[in-house]
């Protein structure tokens, strides 16, 4: 009996030590300050060219600062792109951040120019919901075609621009039978991932959160395919989100996506869920779309909150927004897909309210000691306080939108996502996964 009591006491002390170590590690990391604010806005404003043109845009209703909400960010060299979804009062949806500063923050300039902001004849960009830059210096734009996020003005389409010349390379409409759920009549492209093997062999993955589908585009033959799975569906148990103590309700299906360059797994979650799923993209790269070639895997209820935007590092670290926590989490895909292998890399109740976009930028750095150039990875995160958008209760006298950044290696240092001795051991990394149709 004495031996058993001694064992229990020892185990209790050991557990306390482990808990203390985790708490100390998280405290030492200082999650509140692990990302730096690069840009911030009280409200979004534009470089109209003159005060007279700006006032004319306000008087005509073309510009209403209370209706401009950023939803995506990306960077190419010294250009930072900001996508603002189109509401009445949004003069331009696809923009670059200029060096000019207004009362709300840095002014935006339409990209490629103001002519592309003219959408009423469907020749320009209606609503750039998501953007992605590939390794061949192409900017891919997912235009939802929606006004006010509900009214279909033009057919949804994909566009690709040459960033070196700002010229349009390709524009293709998404066919109606692909863009819309045939049973419900619903559709809404909201997320974009680009896999560019070479300029003529590029695959684009599009999440349809309203129609609960994954749309795949192949630029080699301009073909589209629409895939459905119950893993794309929203979970009504988690339709209420809370950010900084403010609740709002959504019913979005598949939302944030990230493609691993290591395993070719596409990771995704419905916004209204606590789950993380993935599907291997090898069959799609070979144009094999038969259902028996597709296996959807994942873990249900692995998160303790809804997860939003996602991105993958070159070494297989998945980053994801954690809605309720106002945080960014991580998981190294070389580890088993379990909650205890996940960690937080940033958390700030003020600056990280609803991470709507995360991107990883490859920065070139010169090492004098090694006498060589190597690539560093840098993360950009966009927070847009979606709770304020849905509830329509912004205070435009305070900062509402932010772009933050941090070195990826610094973010994962001293976390469970850092490189481990098991980095190359993949035998049991998904040992608790479930096969899902």
From Swiss-Prot:
Expressed in which tissues: Found in and secreted from the hypopharyngeal glands of the worker honey bee (at protein level); expression peaks at 20 days post eclosion. Expressed in the spermatheca of adult queen bees (at protein level); Expression levels are higher in mated queens than in virgin queens. Expressed at low level in the brains of adult worker bees. Protein abundance does not seem to correlate with transcript abundance.
Cited SUPFAM superfamilies: YWTD domain (SSF63825)
InterPro entries in alphabetical order: 6-blade_b-propeller_TolB-like, Royal_jelly/protein_yellow
Gene3D superfamilies reported in the protein's UniProt record: TolB, C-terminal domain (2.120.10.30)
Subcellular location: Secreted
Task of the protein: Component of royal jelly, a substance produced in the hypopharyngeal gland containing proteins, free amino acids, fatty acids, sugars and other nutrients, which is fed to developing larvae by worker nurse bees. All larvae are fed some royal jelly (also known as worker jelly) early in their development but it forms the principal source of nutrition for larvae destined to become queen bees. Produced in the spermatheca of adult queen bees, along with other major royal jelly proteins, where it may act as a nutrient supply for sperm stored by mated queens, or be involved in energy metabolism.
Family: Belongs to the major royal jelly protein family.
Protein name per the record: Major royal jelly protein 6
